[in-house]
Structures are given as C-alpha cells and as structure tokens.
Amino acid sequence: MLLGPSNALDAALRRAGEEAALRGDRRVGTDHLLLALLHDDDVAALVGADVDRGRAAARELDRAALAAIGLDLGDDLPAAPTRARTANLPLTSAAREAVGRSGAFADADRVRRIEPRHLLAALRERAEPDPAAVLLAALG
C-alpha cells in the first residue's frame, strides 16, 4: 500500500519551488523538479550532473531560446536572484503529471514511499519539448 511521498521527496518538491522562484518563474515546471532533484547526490550521480551544472545548462537553454527569436543579450542575461521567494508556487500540468506518475514507479518497486529516484524515472519518461527532457538532453 503506497503511503505517499518520502521526506526526501517532500524536500525536493519544496526545493523545486525555490528553483522556480530563483529563475523568476511563477509556476513549478518539470525542469524545476529536475533541478531540485540534482541537489541529491544519489540523483546527481544517476544523471551525471550536479545542481550547479544543471542551472548552467538551463541558463544556456534560456539564452538559446532568446537568440532563436532574435534577442541576443550576450553576457547581459540577468543573474539568478540570490534569494528565492518563499511562497508556494503552483505546479504546471506537466509537473503534476510527473509527480503523479512517480507513484507508479514506487508501486513497481513495491515500496511504500515515493522517493526522489521515482520522480527522476517519471521525468526521464518525458519527451521533448518538455522542459525536463530538454534539460536532460543538454546535460548529456
């Protein structure tokens, strides 16, 4: 019987809100979920990148997206704020779907709590142009 998210996953979901706020976003997307998971050393080892590398890759993806519409900010791309807003940000529909899907991975593992690795598995299922899929591809 699945009991819900583990303490580690709860912490990752809170960090995802912080990651979204640091990037100036008003909703938590799948990319923010991935960045939050990269705070965990075990998940970072599975992905092959830590949160700093993930944030750098996300900034480069932002830069490329802006360049694609003719905006080249060069080195003037605003730096992330050093302090995130603490308000609870809503999840995008894709992020809600990934969190929900992580329960199926926990069920398949026959465990009672959803762990960060289960959310990572759900994010790895996402296809481009989903933000987590694009970020995972950029991380190699």
PLM segments and residue spans:
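Histone-fold recognition with a strong bias for associated Lys/Arg-rich disordered tails
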Residues: M1-G140
